Amino acid sequence: MNELSSVDWSRAQFALTALYHFLFVPLTLGLSFIIAIMETIYVKTGNERWKKITKFWLSLFAINFAIGVATGIIMEFEFGTNWANYSWFVGDIFGAPLAVEGIMAFFLEATFFAVMFFGWDKVSKKFHLISTWCVAIGSNLSAFWILVANGWMQYPVGMQFNPDTARNEMQSFFEVALSPVAISKFLHTIGSGYVISALFVMGISAWFILKGRHIIEAKKSLVVGASFGLVCSVFLFFSGDESAYRVTQTQPMKLAAMEGVYQGEHRAGLVPFGILNPKKTIDNNESVFLFDITIPYALSILGNRDPNSFVPGIEDLIHGNEDRGIEPMQERIDKGKIAIQALKDYKLAKDNNDTAAMATHKSILEANFKDFGYGYLEKPTDAIPPVALTFYSFHIMVALGSLFFLLFIATLYLTMANDIEKFRKILWLCLLCIPLGYIAAEAGWIVAEVGRQPWAIQDLMPVHIAATELGKVNVQISFWIFAVLFTALLIAEIKIMLTQIKKGFDAYAGYSTLMGKGEK
């Protein structure tokens, strides 16, 4: 077994931080809107029971929000400590949306969070309601700007490389912010957060019904959660369709890994279920699947909006396909090396004040810059992501998403029919789907990030070039420190939440409840 390098440990540390952080983010995104909806019902009806319900869910939101912020701050610092080359190469672009997020979105939600949490009976009902909606909007604005940054890494646009500084510089902020890849990534990510939040509300409400406690409040919460989840599941279906389309156009290797496509084909079928052959590689003729179910034409429709279109496979992207205008990977690597050498020659000519040579080398660099990152790959197969992990993560995400959609329909129907108590298996399934929701979301992020390997920035910078040159021991130590810290934070959140949940709706779930002085 190969020993892990410093870069591998840096990747593992960032993956650890991101996956832990994303345990908290989805609940913040969706639960904030669910709380706002519940409080709107309270303000419209004046029913104090809805106030009780709102304050209960607000207390759980506050716990999750605080710990989510802590893990997010650590992740931002890792860009500078573990990925200094990346920060230098694209900091001018990547930092802009993060700065806007801090100035606009985070301060919006932080300001109104205090009013939302501590302002009960201190400000008017309408102002408190406005504050709650501002927190929900601010939380989702934060997600937008962060996902704009991530979307740019997947599809870099709106910039120009400056050979004098060896940095990419922003040319169009709006092209970066309104990139179709960034927009589709934002919509799909917040959609998953909304579904997780709906499952969270449904699961806890189901627990109360199973225990025979707070039946009225639990049923009302169940209706809101299931309704919200059903609408968001439909939204998630369409945003996922758009996301897959964008991946096909901008990251064909990722799509090939997602669906286990080795040989490209016209009228390509979609595999909703399959077992990959572990012996299959690009260099042999083994079957791709040990078992699979295929829907004809579906992948061509999903990827190109045309049932007769061609979907390239891994072999096409590595060996090339002249008929489809796909360059062999080795040619892209060669062009990348030409671009890298042209940059070196440009700097040397600049040191010698040779303007003619500078112009020549700059021209060569610009002609080959789109393949710049490929010059750092040792061999064509380095451009292939981990196929099995990407494939199974994608299919787990889709399968669980389909399950959630059916659960929302069943739960909403049975609750509205006032029969939900009779279907205890459905209630237990609601409870079980809380962790399953997080598994689906984490699987989605694995698809997004593992599926684009080896790239830190698509086509421009591989991960091993983006990393800071750190001693392996230093990264190992920080990895285990973060692993222990994040695990402790997760355990603390779960423990505090369970304590709060056990208090029930009658505690009113205001700020005083967290201090042990809940209203009775």
Residue ranges and their predicted role:
Residues 25-34, 104-112, 193-204, 396-412, ...:
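Hydrophobic alpha-helical transmembrane segments
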Residues 62-70, 133-153, 229-240, 430-448:
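Hydrophobic alpha-helical membrane-insertion segments
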Residues 1-19, 46-53, 77-99, 151-187, ...:
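Membrane-interface interhelical loops and short amphipathic "cap" helices
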